């Protein structure tokens, strides 16, 4: 399951060209694309996100008690202005690049703030809405300290880990949300990281 490089046209923005993006076939119609250092000016973007996103601390029911969600979150819905211009540029560039495969634009931008190594997200697929029944895409841009995104086949099997660094782009496509799960595991030591996840309409 090695990454294979393919060449694409450059987007008409200040973002890095899509040339050199690498696709990894996972099986069962699932794949991931990886492009290192796609977003420029990442220190400025990270600082803006920390300061201006209206972060929320959520709680969820687990058995008979409420527990804190181990990260801060916020989702920019359709029509909401994104907190930094490059995020809108990234959304539009992703839409243009993937439209032949996806067939629709990226519409929402979910943000997760992992404050340190204790913050995490458990194994899951984005299967609320159409992701449960249709092939779709979720595009993730990472800002801040490197963290590993782990993936494993749904129902069990060998897992893989992809370290996402400052400005890196990872796109999960095809059947990935239905046939695979992903997670950001806890680690002993890590600095702050923010991920921005672009999704089409009605994929969560």
Model-derived features: positions:
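Non-heme Fe(II) oxygenase metal-center motifs and adjacent flexible, charged/small-residue loops
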Residues: 1-204
